[in-house]
């Protein structure tokens, strides 16, 4: 694979001196490609749709948020890739959340607020509910072997019906977590392959899970400096916490990783609610 990456980069005028695998990229294979004093990200996406979606949103957000610059895209052995600029800084995992400064946390809130201020391309208010129902239906069909499957599915479907059209329709990242934020001279956002429009509350979930109350209030303060906090946030986060845990099990199932720590972590979230 690395030899082919070298060949592709060379065709685009970049002489490679070193390639390192990115270790915290879960839904794609990413490499840091070094060329003398420059660095690039060579990212192989899960499928063509995700490649095109990420390329589209990188171009959309380039002059709005701090994001990498898309350089070129292509196909490698029936796998689809994007090449973008490397962002200098540090990315931390959830377990290192206590290393964040108050300024870091506030800036994360500002970053999310700026993203949610971007005009959505899909004005269809029903598309988010359709996405939720389709995600739940697919998960339900694939998780017949999970003892809580029926109970969780019925609960979530009922919640979706109750929340119809009662949300702030914004552009969502869908995986707004610490691992997709780079802390450097500025705060950068990465990983745009799953973006779509929908309920703004969903993007608060990953930070809600790991920040303590004081830190989450600071995060909200940063967000509120850009735009209003969505109504009924805590109530909706309870729903999305279960929805995300349930559909994450299906993510693991599709990638044959049901023995992973990530799978077990999400099973425990469901068990706390339904057992």
Indicate where each model-derived feature is located:
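An alpha-helical support segment within catalytic cores of ATP-dependent transferases
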Residues: 1-14, 106, 117-174, 265-274
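ATP-binding pocket architecture of kinase catalytic cores
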Residues: 20-125
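Active-site acidic catalytic loop and adjacent metal/ATP-binding pocket
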Residues: 29-34, 42, 157-204
């Amino acid at each position: 694979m690395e030899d082919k990456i070298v060949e592709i980069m060379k065709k685009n005028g970049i002489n490679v001196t070193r390639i390192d695998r990115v270790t915290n990229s879960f839904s794609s294979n990413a490499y840091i490609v070094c060329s003398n004093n420059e660095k690039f990200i060579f990212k192989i996406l899960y499928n063509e749709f995700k490649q095109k979606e990420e390329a589209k949103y990188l171009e959309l957000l380039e002059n709005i948020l701090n994001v990498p610059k898309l350089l070129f895209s292509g196909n490698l052995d029936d796998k689809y890739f994007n090449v973008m600029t490397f962002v200098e800084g540090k990315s931390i995992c959830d377990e290192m959340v206590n290393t964040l400064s108050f300024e870091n946390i506030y800036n994360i809130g500002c970053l999310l607020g700026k993203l949610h201020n971007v005009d959505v391309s899909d004005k269809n208010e029903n598309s988010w509910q359709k996405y939720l129902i389709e995600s739940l239906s697919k998960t339900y069909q694939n998780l017949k072997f999970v003892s809580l499957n029926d109970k969780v599915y019925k609960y979530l479907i009922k919640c979706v019906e109750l929340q119809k059209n009662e949300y702030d329709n914004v552009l969502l990242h869908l995986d707004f977590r610490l691992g997709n934020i780079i802390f450097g001279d500025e705060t950068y956002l990465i990983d745009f392959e799953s973006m779509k429009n929908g309920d703004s509350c969903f993007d608060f979930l990953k930070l809600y899970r790991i920040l303590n109350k004081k830190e989450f209030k600071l995060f909200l303060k940063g967000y509120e400096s850009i735009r209003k906090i969505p109504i009924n946030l805590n109530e909706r986060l309870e729903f999305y916490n279960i929805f995300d845990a349930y559909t994450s099990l299906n993510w693991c199932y599709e990638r044959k990783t049901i023995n992973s720590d990530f799978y077990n972590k999400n099973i425990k979230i469901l068990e706390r609610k339904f057992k």
